[in-house]
Amino acid sequence: MKQTFRFIKPIERITHLKPNATMMLFLASVLAVIMANSSLSTIYHEILEYPINLTIGGHEVFSHHGETMTLLQFVNDVLMVIFFLAVGLEIKQEILVGELSSFKKAMLPIVGAIGGMIVPVLFFLLVVHEGPGARGAAIPMSTDIAFALAALAVLGSRVPASLKVFLTALAVADDIGGIIVIALFYSSHINIGMLAIAFGILFIMYLMGRMHVSNLGLYFVCTFFVWLFFLQSGIHTTIAGVLAAFMIPARPGLHAKNLRAEMRSLFEAMPNDKIRQSGSSLILSHNQINVINSMRKIARKAISPMQLMEEYLSPIVGYFVLPLFAFANAGITLGGVTADALWGVPMAVFLGLFVGKPLGIYFFTYGFVKMRLCPWPEGMSRLNLMAVSLFGGIGFTVSLFIATLSYAGAEHLLFLNEAKLGIFVASIFAAVVGIVTLRYELNLENAKAQKS
């Protein structure tokens, strides 16, 4: 049987995500809401205020503006760097071999993402255009790729592959826009010296890649120091994760085409030493173990540091970082939101995500196709596009993150609480209406196919 070796495109990997990670994210969010609105609320807030400290040589590593980080700050300023490191690796893969690897492929998802960022901001500002509440205008810009794909997966194998590809590429382009917004608008009091040191370490990482250094431990250590100096520089630390990801080399030590030949030669060199066996127990000879270890090293060399790091980070992000982030940030206090306040930030976020986001994605995409600037995506109808645009309105993770940046500090706590409410309601509406719309379209197509 003929076999071929190739990169597993990130689009394929992301669209086959295990649902368990998304379920953990959902359950962590529900737990946070329950605790924040019950007799456990005091315990919940005490957990978030728990100090996290690590002292090395008299220096507090996890300190924020000279103060020891709380668990909430640790999650948002440290653990989310790991999330954005993983996001950066996915973006790099998309640019290299995925749906953003050529101008023709990338144009439509990027156009859709731009529309999905501009229009939600306009809808937000129509409702809240002045005062401290307007600081959250960027909140409805983001799409939560995990929840969006989970909503798409509800309809099973009937969903055309082109829809999954377009939605994933759209979300990746959306992430790029979100990262730029964080870098430009959520950084203050920039320390040029610290920033210069951070970029110096990034340059060292780049040189390591050029010199074919494949030791992941070295890249993780460098990333830690890049984060540390970004923390002191005034630029938000999540940008450190993205920039570090771009420095991780995508070139493997052994080309995949040569892997089979290397493995065959090692397999042929396997000594015919007697294998000692007792029941289900097997004892290999030292020579056999040496050959098997050589096979392991050769196989590892065939995977680039970029993909290897992404494989390591994926379960950590999915099963630890994002659920903990959701638990720390999703605890909206429903009793603190008044009926009058619903027409402020909550409505602005809701309209931005549920109305502005889908309309922006749909009309920018459809407009470019009608102007013949881009070809229509294969296998996608106008109703399909509207459904995918609705899934783009599922904000959640990154929207919550931008909300915490927009309304930082005790004086903005009420706005933060209101923004969370808007994110929750809009994401649920977008998911439900998107599923209903796509199900209707798929049933319509199925009925037409049966008639013909």
From Swiss-Prot:
It catalyses: Na(+)(in) + 2 H(+)(out) = Na(+)(out) + 2 H(+)(in). Pfam families: Na_H_antiport_1. It comes from the Bacteria. The chain crosses the membrane at residues 23-43, 71-91, 108-128, 136-156, 165-185, 189-209, 216-236, 316-336, 349-369, 385-405, 418-438. It is found in: Cell inner membrane. Its main location: membrane. GO terms for cellular component: plasma membrane. Belongs to the NhaA Na(+)/H(+) (TC 2.A.33) antiporter family. Na(+)/H(+) antiporter that extrudes sodium in exchange for external protons. This is Na(+)/H(+) antiporter NhaA. It comes from Porphyromonas gingivalis (strain ATCC 33277 / DSM 20709 / CIP 103683 / JCM 12257 / NCTC 11834 / 2561). The gene is nhaA.
